[in-house]
Amino acid sequence: MSRICDVCGKGPVVGNNVSHANNKTKKVWYPNLQSLRCLDGKTGAVKRMKVCTRCLRSGFVKKAL
C-alpha cells in the first residue's frame, strides 16, 4: 500500500528523533491521507483515490456523493 497522495504526490518524509541526550533514531512522517470516492474531472466517473487533507481542503478534489 503506497502512502502517496494521488493529487500532489506528497509522500513520506524521513528524519531523526533527537532525544535529550542527543541520541538520534530514524523516524518517518507520513502524510495525512484519506481514502475517498472522487469525481474524475475529465470523464465524470467515480474513482477511489488516496488524497492528503491539504489537497482536500484546497478544493483540488471533488468528492462524490
Swiss-Prot record:
InterPro entries reported for this sequence: Bacterial_rp_bL28, Ribosomal_bL28, Ribosomal_bL28/bL31-like_sf, Ribosomal_bL28_bact-type, Ribosomal_bL28_sf
One GO CC term, this protein: ribosome
Keywords of this entry: Ribonucleoprotein, Ribosomal protein
Example GO biological process: translation
GO molecular function, one term: structural constituent of ribosome
SUPFAM superfamilies: L28p-like
Coiled-coil spans in chain: none
Record HAMAP family: Ribosomal_bL28
Family annotation (NCBIfam families): L28
Protein family according to the UniProt entry: Belongs to the bacterial ribosomal protein bL28 family.
Name of this chain's protein: Large ribosomal subunit protein bL28
Organism: Syntrophus aciditrophicus (strain SB)
